[in-house]
Design a protein with these regions (language model features):
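Short helix/loop capping segments that flank catalytic or ligand/cofactor-binding pockets
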Residues: 50-51, 128-129, 139-141, 202-205, ...
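A conserved helix-loop-beta module that forms one wall/lid of the active-site cleft
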Residues: 132-205
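Glycine-rich phosphate-binding loop of ATP-grasp-fold ATP-dependent ligases
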Residues: 168-169, 192-216, 237-239, 261-281
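Conserved ATP-binding module of the ATP-grasp superfamily
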Residues: 165-167, 188-194, 208-239, 295-302
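Short, flexible loop/turn elements at secondary-structure junctions
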Residues: 122, 173, 199, 231-233, ...
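ATP-binding N-terminal substructure of ATP-dependent carboxylate-amine bond-forming enzymes
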Residues: 1-148, 177-179
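ATP-dependent carboxylate/phosphate-activation module, predominantly the ATP-grasp catalytic core
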Residues: 234, 242-300, 317
Length: 317
């Protein structure tokens, strides 16, 4: 059986480097189709940027797992992988970066005098050090800035400053059920609450609390840190991805989010997929949401950030 994989960007002709204004999607596509510098995406799988090699010439995936069993011409997976339990995506990527097979693959496919560019979703300060030592360009914001902005508390504060507010909430610290109830009552949040801690996957750091029994169940994960306490709404979850460039914020299409489906995730508040269709938002809601995302992007730019970010748009039905 033949496997058809779109790799048309790999066969596009080279072009001289130049910085010029790109005015539409066609020009953006041409710009990336003539890219001469190898770009490698690192990850457990190629899921996050699947299909980008159709747009970007010299774009390859270096992954721990190979879903194509060697059939995809632009996916590289080391053949020798001793059993190892990873605690995070960062650990997987750092392991791949230091793997001899991976380093040999990059060296063999990168022209002399060219510094390969590295992209990934999960990285940390160790990743930066490894890339620096190997002579790779990690084309991402500094890990310290990303960690700072990854806090749900910080992004809530920045959103408020930018005029892109969240669901009614209060940022606070609580030590017991009485403290949580008092903070929620003072903020007018009602009796059904959603509590988030600053860092971590939404499914593991989002807690639905409407009784003291709920509090006892989750308190060990909440006490001792600043939290975001929100009014629980009848939410239709929507997500949008945007890119902050030197020319401003480009907002992508709005997608519905799949949250908490038991067959797909063990977590009540856990993300488990997206769907995209025209009626995700009404025209007015889409226009308003686009403006709010751009405001947040402008505020992130003031922090020195540039690159991709994702925003959850909560629609109270």
């Amino acid at each position: 059986m033949d496997v058809s994989v779109g790799t048309d960007a790999a066969f596009a002709p080279s072009a001289a480097k130049s910085r010029r204004e790109l005015n539409n999607i066609s020009e953006v596509r041409h710009f990336f189709r003539t890219n001469d510098v190898p770009i490698y995406f690192f990850g457990a799988t190629p899921f996050n940027l699947l299909g980008l090699d159709r747009w970007v010439r010299n774009f390859s995936y270096i992954t721990y797992y190979d879903a194509w069993d060697g059939a995809h011409p632009r996916v590289f997976t080391p053949s020798h992988k001793p059993y190892q339990e990873f605690e995070s995506g960062e650990e997987i990527n750092n392991w791949l970066l230091t793997n001899p097979e991976v380093r040999a693959y990059i060296d063999g496919s990168t022209p002399r005098g060219i510094r390969p560019k590295i992209a990934m979703v999960f990285f940390d300060a160790e990743t930066e050090n490894i890339c620096r030592e190997l002579g790779y360009d990690l084309i991402l914001p500094p890990a310290s800035l990303r960690e700072h902005l990854d806090s749900k508390i910080v992004t809530t504060q920045l959103g408020n400053e930018a005029g892109a507010p969240s669901v009614p909430n209060v940022l606070t610290k609580v030590e017991d059920w009485a403290g949580l109830s008092a903070a929620a009552e003072k903020a007018g949040l009602g009796d059904e609450l959603v509590v988030q801690t600053p860092y971590g996957d939404s499914g593991k750091t989002t807690f639905f609390i409407s009784s003291e029994a709920d509090w006892r169940k989750h308190s060990a994960d909440i006490v001792g840190q600043e939290i975001k306490v929100m009014r629980r709404i009848n939410n239709r979850p929507v997500a949008v991805e945007a890119v902050l460039t030197r020319c401003g914020t480009i907002v992508g299409p709005f997608m519905s989010e799949l949250i908490g489906y038991k067959k797909l995730t063990p977590s009540q508040g856990g993300w488990c997929g997206n769907e995209m269709y025209p009626e995700v938002l009404t025209y007015e809601n889409r226009r308003t949401a686009t403006q709010l995302v751009r405001r947040l992007g402008d505020r992130l730019a003031n922090e020195g950030y540039r690159g991709f970010f994702e925003v959850d748009v909560l629609v109270d039905t």
